[in-house]
Amino acid sequence: LFIDLKHSTNLRTTAKELDVPERRFVRFLIERRFVYRTASGNVLPYANVKNAGLFCVKDYYNHGHIGSYTLVTPQGKLYFAQLREMILLVS
């Protein structure tokens, strides 16, 4: 596994770093209540103690559109790397 511990990365890049399928990774995060999917389809972390330091949310404004996206912090990447085998078991 190659995990960049200097930068926070989006869910897709984090899944690639962990060598797990992106959809399976997101499904794991949703099932384990680390994140939830908004009505608009965004994936955002729950604000709870379990998630402290694992994620950060960035807001953006682009051509009149305002939105948010979730990044996994280096601490979060290490945490999910330890759960990699469990993530791979998600159907």
Identify the residue ranges that each predicted region occupies.
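Positively charged, aromatic-accented nucleic-acid-binding surfaces
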Residues: 2, 6-12, 16-91
